Every structure is written in C-alpha cells, then in structure tokens.
Amino acid sequence: YKPDTTIYYPGKLYLKRSSENGSIEQQLIFINASTVLLSVASTHKALFRFWGNVLTNDNVCSAEKNTFLVIAPSGEGVAVTFPPEAGLLANENGYETLSTTSGKTDIVISFFTNQASQRSAIQKATSVLAEVESYKKQTADRWENYLTDIIRNDMPNAYNRVAAKAVMTLISNWKVARGDLFHDGVVPSHGVGYFMGFWGWDSWKHAVALAHFAPELAKDQVRTMFDYQTPDGRIIDCIYSDASENNAR
C-alpha cells in the first residue's frame, strides 16, 4: 500500500493508502487534550491486525483487558485501547491484536501523567469506543465554533484560509497544565525541545489571537505567565513543566 492522500483538516488528520487490492483510510482525531481517536477503514473488508514494539527498556509494558499500557519511570504513560473483540496480546516488549471487525475499526490512544489519570484515561477511552460517532461530532462542532468566530464574509477567501491555518496552528500547539505548569497555554512550536514551554515574548501574542475564538485558553495563557512572576514584578523569559529548566532572565 502506497500513501496517496494526506490532508490536515481542522481537527483531523486524514491519510489514505492504496494498492491494486483496494485502499485503507485512517483518520486521527483529538477528542480532548489527552485522548486521540484513530479510525481505520478498508475497502476490501479484510480483518485488521495491529502490532507495536516499545523502543526503550526503561518503560514498563502491561495489558488490562483490551488496553495496552506503556509507563515511563516518571509515571507518565500511554494507553492504547482496542475494541473488546480485538484479542489483545501483550508482553514486556510490545503488543499484537489477533483480529478486529472486518473492514473498519477504532482505536483510542490516551496520555496520562500518574496512576489517577491513567484510570480516568482508560475510562474515557472506553466511553469513546462506545460512542465513536457522537465524539466525532462533538469534535467537529468544537472546530466549527472556532472557525465560525474567525472566518469573515468581508474577507477574500485567501485571507480566510490563512486565518483558519492560524487557528489550527494555535490549537495544535495547546499544552495542558502539567507538572510545574499550573495553567494551560500554547507553545511556540513542537519542532525542538526548548520550544515546549511557555515563552513570555510569544504568550502575549498567543493570548491576543486566542481571545477571538478560545477566550478561556487565552486567559490561562496570561495566567501562566504570572505563575512565576518575580517579587519585583518581572515576567520571566520562559517556563516549563519541569521548573528547573525555567529561564528566569
């Protein structure tokens, strides 16, 4: 199968691969900040088989019913939840599913930071798999609301496309409160590690843009800057989920 279509829609990544035997379509949809739905469909109605390997030996792998867990030494981890009929097999190195529903299947990938959030992540994944179409619609409606507040009838279509892309970039760079980050915010980029924090010189601009379509996130973006305000009133350069990496200049 060769990839022939890749499209990043607002709120959804779409990939299609084709061969002489048919095509396979994948949709990756962020249900919320820590839950991702992967929908896979095939035109030739074959049974799907999935497998994966863990790349480092420091992580602990296990399975709970139809969920494969990978937990790092920090307690953070990833849960991959399959439909109950998938027949999940797992060991210390990875996982494999024996079979799933012919022609179509849905998988939920969840991220968690500790044992308490691990439990809620699995519960959320189970809920998503039970009502896939409902969660897809909720996500589509959320993005529709973002764009409705930005797209303007008095602007050329080319400008509206730039505005939509700006919204997609800001929301895609949304980082939730975690560790020493006490409020949500937007990071400048996922391209390099040092951009994975909240920077003073970017955060104000992020907040101004977000105020038009995600006002609560805009407020949190400002709040997080004041979480590390110095006694003399200064807002420091950048802050991270590990405060030892903060740059207080």
Q: What would you call each of these model-derived segments?
A:
Residues 1-13, 31-35:
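Accessory carbohydrate-recognition regions in carbohydrate-active enzymes
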Residues 19-37, 41-196:
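Acidic/polar, glycine-enriched structural segments that form the non-catalytic walls/loops
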Residues 12, 18-27, 237-249:
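Aromatic/His-enriched, Gly/Pro-containing loop or helix-boundary segments
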Residues 139, 196-249:
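Aromatic-rich carbohydrate-recognition surfaces in CAZymes
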